[in-house]
Amino acid sequence: MAVQEGDDDPFEEQRERVDDSMQRLFRRYGSENAFEYAVAIVASVLARLLDLVPPVMLGVAIDAIFTDSRAFGLGPVPAEWLPATQEGQFALTVAIIAGSFALGAVFHWLRNWGWNASSQNITHDVRVDAYNQMQRLGMDFFSDKQTGELMSILSNDVNQLERFLNDGLNSASRLIVMVIGVSLVLFTYNWQLALVALVPVPLIALFTYGFISIIRPKYKTMRATVGALNSRLENNLGGIQVIKSSNTERYEDDRVDDASMEYFDANWDAIWTRIKFFPSLQAISGFGFALTFVVGGYWVFAGAPGPLTGELTLGTFVVFIQLSQQLTWPMAQFGQVINMYQRAEASSARVFGLMDEHGALADDDELPDLAVEGGRVEYDDVTFGYDEEPIVEGVSFTVEPGETAALVGPTGAGKSTVLKLLLRMYDVDEGEIRIDGQDVRDVSLRSLRQSIGYVGQDTFLFYGTVRENIAYGTFIADDEEIVEAAKAAEAHEFIRDLPEGYDTMVGERGVKLSGGQRQRISIARAVLKDPEILVLDEATSDVDTETEMLIQRSLDELTEDRTTFAIAHRLSTIKDAERIVVLEDGRIVEHGGHDELLENGGLYAHLWGVQAGEIDELPEEFIERAAKRQARTEAGND
């Protein structure tokens, strides 16, 4: 889908709430870099003032030494302090010019240090703050956002801020100081010719105002399209195995081409606007310089033209010509500064749009830590849904310390959601979840998740070594503890056979390992964590029978004397659970032990019959309900 101006921006609602995001950026982060800004600003002023010294001294030398049209003087410096001979005056002029260059180099260095240091500090803080805020958002936020779009904000948009905070502010400071300094010098020498030299200023202001109003929505669209392109690229790289196995490379080529072309069009639209704007500024600035040259030159050789009065010496004329050139450069660069500002403003709005996202789970550091005494877990009339659509409703059951509770039911029954509520991936809409009598919302999120180990069906390994992945979340573990955890997870043997053993790189998301190997590393991670409560979400769903046997053996050891929740489609793996909770359409329809549920002849017995191959003995009502659930699932995926 093409991204139009103002449309399809995932953070549009937050962007509209951002009130002058650039001012907000400086209010929030500027004070922390006050020293760097002070150095940069003072150094910028002094460096630019020193840049005015050579042309001024050249004008003095021409009038006093070469044309002898006025006495040699340096403003407030007493005449008796100055050399009386032309040779001495010339030597002093050279010394002052050389000194201004040397001292100016020092201040230019300090200026660059100040702007670079402040920009790096701020962009680092912005990126980290935005990431920290994103980490604290509930899983419903990530369900609605694309990874590539979020990466674009944390990378591209923050980098755009860095360019303005460094190059943009640096150029802006030089521009402001130069325009003010040059104007003061010119008016001091000859206010009439100074007015002529400043003729381009109102024209440039008018052109710039028009440029801002035109370019702002274009940059907004461009930032949205680059986010969409990054999302497409990230999605395709993550699914490269599916693309290759489906022989859909050409199809994905076309989709990336479409997304890239949308970005190309939006970017070129902004570029074309800049292309038309910048030459106009240069032409106006050049016109101002030419006008100053013509009027001043005529004044020197033929006297004051038209309504102008007074005398203009050759030295003063040379000062005007040189300073007019210094005035022309910042005028031409003014458009570049405005361009960088507009880019940064669009990016800062997206960054603060992310920071302003609602839905962060409350995690007050002052909340007490969870105190797990035995691991008794109670679900008390729990209801939760997305967008007012209930996923689980009125769920109530209790798991005693050391028990294993299995959650079973058809696809979409709400099993995984029930366990995610325990981990506070989401917060309940109604009811309570208690661990040893403590509401999970009344304890710190850190201590809650530290007390719960999670092994899911979609095992995620980070890019790094096997050792680092086992120790993830328990970073203080030593090598001996890591090896013992791997042995308990039936992983030590295959790890030892890897090329570098525990120091073998697993590749992006663990692609160098098989599914069963990744799962056993995940189990080793849970063993090392040694949690009081364990959550197993389809931990053996995608492995072969032999691997399942090994994993199940390690899980049996891990769950011993530990409160455990397990979800499994293969009912044979959970038939020994002390408590089996059967869900359908987000509600508990029955619960009990395996034998008891089979005798009841309810949904659990029917699901067991399906896996036992007893299809012909299933009631027609069960088959009809299954068909309706499948139809709803397919409709929801469309």
PLM-predicted stretches and their roles:
Residues 3, 8-12, 243, 575-638:
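C-terminal portion of ABC ATPase nucleotide-binding domains
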Residues 121-140, 146-155, 220-262, 328-335, ...:
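Short cytosolic helices in intracellular loops of multi-pass membrane proteins
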Residues 128, 357, 430-434, 442, ...:
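ABC ATPase nucleotide-binding domain helical subdomain, centered on the C-loop/LSGGQ "ABC signature"
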Residues 66, 185-198, 280-349:
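Helix-loop-helix
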Residues 2, 37-107, 188, 192, ...:
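Transmembrane helix-loop-helix hairpins at lipid-water interfaces of multipass membrane proteins
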